[in-house]
Amino acid sequence: MSDSFKLTVELLDFWHCGTGKGSGEFLDAVVERDRVGLPYVPGKMLKGLLRDAVGLCEAWGHVDRGLQRVLFGSDAFDERTGQPAQPASPGALLVSNACLPTVLTAWLAHPGNASYRLALFRDVFSTAVDVESGVAEGKSLRGMEVTVPMTLEAEIKPMPGQTPPAGWQSQLALALPLVGAVGQQRSRGLGRCILQPVREP
């Protein structure tokens, strides 16, 4: 078996992985793009979601005890005390960004295909409604740029100098169904997804 673990992230709905910045007065949040203007899920975010999923599998007894810490490291802060964790560890795995397939990325990056790149994005708006009157509250309109559904690819491999425990790929695969959404506003319906391992031929 290869030392790496490849997976697909199938986005089922609009999703938003943002920069925390807006675009002036029109949009309050814009999508983070790579160097050619394409959307992606940052590896750091994906790693955090996988870490939580493995933690659940560990708590339920489906994977080896201590696997979450070995693969993904310890928290920077102790959740119980709020103090820095002692000692903090980075974990054994490196998680790449989840991006569009290489061939599609190369095609979309062509200068003549700018209109297709723009077609990957939409603008959505929301507002707060007064529960008594049923009327929109003043100055509550918010605009967000989102990305259309698509399938992304990511790769997970050992960090240089680290040796994960034998069988880590199969144990990690057990946790993938527990990641149900990615990006911002996951609890409000954005970013529903299915994570699946890429089977080697």
Language-model features: locations:
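RNA-binding basic/glycine-rich loop and surface signature characteristic of RAMP-family CRISPR effectors
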Residues: M1-F121, A136-P201
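Intrinsically disordered, low-complexity linker/loop segments enriched in Gly/Pro
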Residues: V129, G134-V135
